[in-house]
Amino acid sequence: MDLSIRRMRKEDLDWLYRLLSDPEVMRWLEPLYSREQAETFLFCAGLSESPLIYAAEEQGVPIGYVIDHPYDEHSREIGWVLLPEYWGRGYASALTDLLIQRAGQERR
């Protein structure tokens, strides 16, 4: 696996909308998003000065997003939401490892 995590970009709206409007993906999360709601989510959670979400990529191709932000002074919230074609292939575990490494680097 060649995974990376990067800041979200405006150009991410198409795949983010596909993710957030997929009934299988959103089954246990929020109601399905409209394109306008996905755009608002991108700008508020991904493009803000202190983002809550980041794009997850495999060899430069977006596969979903990760959640990574301080929860309080002693803990952080981490998580992931992946496109269905990447489910069951070990990406969530690998992304969790990346997020833990990232958190450790920030503590130094």
PLM region spans:
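Acetyl-CoA-dependent GNAT
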Residues: K10-E11, R27, P31-G79, L83-E85
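Conserved acetyl-CoA-binding loop-helix of GNAT-fold acetyltransferases
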Residues: G88-A103
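Short loop-to-helix capping motifs
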Residues: D22-P23
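Conserved GNAT acetyl-CoA-binding A-motif
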Residues: Q105-R108
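A short beta-loop-alpha structural element at the N-terminal edge
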Residues: L3-R18
